[in-house]
Amino acid sequence: MMRPLATAALLTAIGIASASAQNAPGERPGTDWATFNGNLMAQKYSTAGQITPENVGRLRKAWEVHTGDVSDGSGDVPVTYFEATPIFANDTVYVGTPFYRIFAITPDTGRVKWVFDPHAKLKALTQPGMKSRGVAYWQAADPQPGQPCQKRVYIGTMDARLIAVDADTGKLCSDFGKAGVLDVNQWNDVHDKWPFSLLQPPTVYKDTLVLGWAGKDWALKKAPVGLVFGLDARTGALKWTFNPLPPKARATSGTADVWASMSVDPERGIVYLPVSSPSPNFYGGNRKEPIPHGTSVTAIDAQTGKTIWTHQLVHHDVWDYDTNSAPSLVDIHKDGKTIPALVQSTKMGYLFILNRLTGEPIYPEREVPVPQSHAQGEQTSPTQPEVQRPVPLVPDRWPGVSTIADIASFGWCSRKAHELRYEGRYTPPSVQGTLVYPATPGGVEWGGGAVDPVSQTYVVNNSYTAQIYRLIPRAEYERETRDKTPKSWHPMKGSPYGVEVKNFTNWLGMPCWKPPYGSLTAVDLTTGRILWKQPFGEVQKWGFYMPDSWGSITIGAPIITRTGLIFIGASMDSRVRAIDERTGKVLWRGRVDAPAVATPATYMYKGKQYVVFVAGGNHLLLPKVSDQVIAFSLP
């Protein structure tokens, strides 16, 4: 049941949370999209309301741009992952490409105002392909008339460069770093081989850029430490550093980095970090000392970087269950009280709903016994946190072998499942091979969810995936990789094992597990109850369309508008959708060039609402890739 619109104070709060950008004159507060997640609180919510459930079926293409920055990986340039969320600020749509170029686009026509090209080396380095999830925007609180770079756009690169350009002209800001470029690798203690890859734009709070990074945490035991940096937005000077690893743990481990987006409580100056797992990802015999920040959501002071609280979501993570998206911040109205809360989605399918001031659970959470490892030197945690409410988005037990996939593989799926170790969620990696469900691409991916602060509804898409994790004894790993390393093998140097991580699919690529493969769910935050849950997306593969009830593997995230509309790409079928927040009913579909795995954006400009998608594709969904930026509006 939808709740009535709250007071104007709530809308004011939403406007405050939308960062330093200003709405155009006459526009309602909260109708820009000035940050990666729509506002600093990572709500992915807009007060724009011109498009409604009644008229959304009339949406038409308003404009599109093709950046030209695309590769299918067949040549010298690695495959591209165009996963950027467009931002709208300064009366301009800005989007960053996988080649680290920035496009400034006129909001109503799609005319390109300017393009910044850093002439970057097109090498994947730490990732399977070329990635950028977009740009960040900052503007001076007291701009100096006639001076350049009073408004700035930032983009990071795979080789650890953070670049600042003038938001009006696209020219480098000479006072930032060295001639507009900051070398973040200067703080990397093992930087020669393992650069800090800046896939996610920095989080901008007042005059501070909060910056995390991604690396090869599966490659070696002592990977770089997962430092988070607080930087001066004007100069790039280091203000503070957050270190997730205790000193003893650093002697034998690394990472626990923050490679995903972050959220900020703008009134309290608190930054919320989704912290990933320590290295190496799939073996923890080298890190028996407690690492409280590993696979956690952690609150830090935006001015100092000091820890306020941490809530660990997985103990001694050996599944690569990184906390992988910004928690959504929302004030929950429950039992006559207003609770400052956050919602943290996870790869395990749990939704952790916490008091964002203390880190304490709002709904029941308990420690439950889990299977133990038999690997050499390993000492897994005897228990893991289990969320009681909301119910997990992904069931605790895997659904069993798909009859169709099994028949198509002449029984291989069922024979393989019988060979693997599986004792439920948190079955650890093993030498014999472990069936992991949900696996690391499952549950909720890096897009996270969206929250409607008025109706108190949280909406999130999730996937159901199974993988095989097999530990490979060091001697065997070295022998078998002497000439060439198989694509699914990872070294974990310094540990007794390498690891093989592969999808549990048959020779046709068909999932060996029963559907569904993807869902979209709405949760009532005041009760923790599921309002509705629907299969999401369609799959056209192996020569036919799968039933709607199967859904699709999903990457990306929804957004919500004031009129109760959910806009989302995220599925395998190269379609974008508008969905009724109250019922889950699809009200509109649009065709795009490739799976739109980036979170969309919406904004008001000159009295008209636009919804913008990046349709770039992703190899997990379809081999098709694209460079399309496309906007829809009413006629």
Over which residues does each language-model region extend?
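Positively charged n-region of N-terminal signal peptides that target proteins for export
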Residues: M1-P4, G449
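Boundary at the C-terminal end of the N-terminal hydrophobic targeting segment
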Residues: A19-N23
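Bacterial N-terminal signal peptides
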Residues: T7-A17
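Short aromatic-glycine motifs in intrinsically disordered, low-complexity regions
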Residues: Q43-I51, A160-A167, A223, Y437-P438, ...
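Repeat-blade elements of multi-bladed beta-propeller folds
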Residues: G30-N37, P78-R101, Q127-R161, W194-L220, ...
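Extracytoplasmic/lumenal domain signature
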Residues: G57-V70, I102-L125, Q139-Q144, L162-K193, ...
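Mature N-terminal segment immediately following signal peptide/propeptide cleavage
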Residues: A24-D72, F88, T521
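Long, low-complexity segments enriched in small/aliphatic residues
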Residues: Q384, Q388-Q467, R474-E476, S519-A522
